[in-house]
Swiss-Prot record:
The keyword Secreted is assigned to this record: yes
Domain notes: The presence of a 'disulfide through disulfide knot' structurally defines this protein as a knottin.
N-terminal signal peptide: none
PROSITE patterns reported for this sequence: HWTX_1
Organism name: Ceratogyrus darlingi
Tissue specificity annotation: Expressed by the venom gland.
The entry's keywords: Amidation, Calcium channel impairing toxin, Disulfide bond, Ion channel impairing toxin, Knottin, Neurotoxin, Secreted, Toxin, Voltage-gated calcium channel impairing toxin, Voltage-gated sodium channel impairing toxin
Protein name: Beta-theraphotoxin-Cd1a
GO CC annotation terms, alphabetical: extracellular region
Source taxonomy: Eukaryota, Metazoa, Ecdysozoa, Arthropoda, Chelicerata
Length: 33
């Protein structure tokens, strides 16, 4: 199970879906460009 767009996340334990990454500043999953 992974976190999708705009889901809140922990940068130290990034569980965002493939092609997403946890933003340290905003603390939600953002699309990786």
């Amino acid at each position: 199970d992974c976190l999708g767009w705009f889901k809140s996340c922990d940068p130290k334990n990034d569980k965002c879906c493939k092609n997403y990454s946890c933003s340290r500043r905003d603390r939600w999953c953002k699309y990786d460009l």
